[in-house]
Regions:
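Macromolecular interaction modules
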Residues: 1-68
Length: 68
């Protein structure tokens, strides 16, 4: 059964366009690789400054290992 790690970022104090570019073009791939995640998705919470990244793992053990 898959397990998920959800990361919420408050971008209200930074340039959200720069953050968006960095996350999409650099960080998401690197984080997925570092976490050894099966899949990774990202997006924005509508009408807010919050960004979400969702990392999918094969099981809860692998998700917990990503946080160590």
């Amino acid at each position: 059964m898959s397990a998920y790690l959800i990361v919420r970022s408050d971008t209200s104090q930074i340039d959200s366009k720069d953050f968006d570019y960095w996350y999409e073009n650099e960080h998401l791939y690197e984080a997925k690789k570092q976490f050894m995640a099966k899949n990774a998705k990202r997006g924005w919470v509508q009408n807010s400054n919050f960004h979400l990244a969702i990392y999918e793992f094969e099981n809860i053990k692998k998700a917990k290992n990503a946080m160590d």
